[in-house]
A protein has these predicted regions:
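N-terminal Rossmann NAD(P)H-binding glycine-rich loop of SDR-like oxidoreductase domains
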Residues: 13, 21
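Conserved NAD(P)H cofactor-binding loop of Rossmann-fold oxidoreductase domains
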Residues: 73-79
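Substrate-binding pocket helix/loop in short-chain dehydrogenase/reductase
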Residues: 81-82, 89-93
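Active-site helix of classical SDR
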Residues: 105, 141
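Residue(s) in the substrate-gating loop at a strand-loop-helix junction
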Residues: 125
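C-terminal helical subdomain
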Residues: 163, 167-168, 179-219
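Nucleotidyltransferase catalytic core that binds NTPs
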Residues: 246-380
Length: 380
């Protein structure tokens, strides 16, 4: 491990990524972990930074160009027939599993091309090497990971770089939340340590339990891909592991968004850091929300919000955010900190928090406000 002093783990707050980050830290490596959700407590040698790959902002990752190693462990999926996946799930899945990996790899490609040591590993999946019914989109995203690793490794070899990308392609893993369970680092510790060892050995593909299980799996797949796929479908149907609901984290916030300004944009940007799918409710004319007249028609206000990249869906909202929960069962409710402690949000906390909703209060910041703009427009 003395070949690595600093490392970056993308998706290192849960699952195998968490175990890899902790194994590196315990070996004395200074680790920067990027994740959408941050842990309540930090381990020694680990710095946590919030990052949602879906925002498209990779600037925090670019600040880590001096790292000795990068591990891309972000990923998500759901066992379900392809037609049961939502459009939002498809977007989130490919942007996280494939596009996010490609962009991070591209950021560090100059380091991989250097003659001095640089190490890179990605957590792929056996589903990316075979046909995988019920995992069609997930398998396709991981197939993109496999193809990119193979091609870029060939480019590195052609340019006489000693560095390589390790594609770790496991099957089902215990001790992760992938199938709805809980994180148990003890169950993934050995796999994490072996991943690090093989990365340092500059291996290019590692399939855990290859001899015991996956050698035969791959042989059956290559012998008759369609027959293998049908058998895989039947096995998953019988396993009882079908995911009935999307596993995306949904965020919701509401506002009038009349006279849109930088404060609104910052609110939307910060909200997206927490969730996979951000729904924004826009109050119609006559709403009791703030009881203020609007200058811009509802349809135009909605169109402005819809055009912002952090927003996934725009709806006409009801007066009360808790009423919207019955229509859109969100996981996060976002609002400014000036609402904390009000009768309205005390009621929301009592009603929504027992349902698993997190109410995130963003610190109020001084700057341009709708009130200022409205006063400027009406001033004579």
């Amino acid at each position: 491990m003395n070949r690595i002093k600093t490392a970056v783990v993308i998706g290192g707050t849960s699952g195998l990524g968490r175990s890899i980050a902790e194994a590196l830290a315990q070996a004395g490596v200074q680790v920067t972990v990027f994740g959408r959700a941050l842990p309540e407590s930090a381990l020694e040698n680990i710095e946590y930074q919030r990052l949602n790959l879906l925002t498209g902002d990779f600037s925090p990752v670019k600040e880590e160009m001096d790292a000795d190693a990068v591990i891309y462990a972000a990923g998500l999926g759901r066992i379900a027939p392809f037609e049961k996946l939502t459009e939002g799930e498809l977007t989130t899945l490919f942007r996280t599993n494939a596009e996010g990996f490609a962009k991070v790899l591209h950021i560090f490609q100059p380091r991989l091309l250097e003659k001095k040591d640089f190490f890179f590993a990605v957590i792929g999946s056996i589903a990316g090497l075979i046909s995988s019914p019920m995992f069609a989109a997930y398998g396709a995203s991981k197939a993109a990971v496999t193809s990119l690793c193979e091609s870029v490794n060939a480019e590195l070899a052609a340019q006489d770089s000693p560095n390589r990308i390790l594609n770790v392609s496991p099957g089902a893993l215990k001790g992760t939340r992938f199938y709805g369970g809980e994180d148990d680092p003890e169950q993934t510790r050995e796999l994490a340590e072996e991943t690090i060892r093989r990365m340092l050995s500059r291996e290019k593909l590692w399939i855990p339990k290859y001899e015991e299980i996956y050698k035969g799996v791959l042989e059956r797949y290559h012998a008759d891909a369609e027959k293998f796929g049908v058998e895989s479908w039947n096995y998953k149907m019988e396993s009882g592991r079908i995911g009935e609901k999307p596993r995306m984290k949904i965020g919701f916030l509401s506002g009038t968004f009349d006279l849109f300004h930088i404060g609104h944009l910052n609110l939307l940007r910060r909200a997206k850091q927490y969730c996979d799918y951000l729904v924004v409710g826009v109050h119609p004319p006559g709403s009791s929300h703030k009881n203020k007249p609007t200058f811009i028609p509802l349809e135009e206000r909605m169109e402005i919000i819809r055009a912002i990249k952090y927003v996934d869906e725009v709806v006409v909202t009801l007066d009360e955010d808790d009423e919207m929960y019955d229509i859109i069962p969100y996981d996060f409710l976002f609002v400014g900190s000036d609402y904390k402690g009000t009768d309205r949000f005390n009621r929301y906390e009592a009603e929504l928090c027992p349902k698993g909703v997190q109410i995130i209060y963003f610190p109020y910041t001084q700057g341009t406000s709708s009130t200022q703009l409205r006063e400027a427009l009406t001033r004579k």
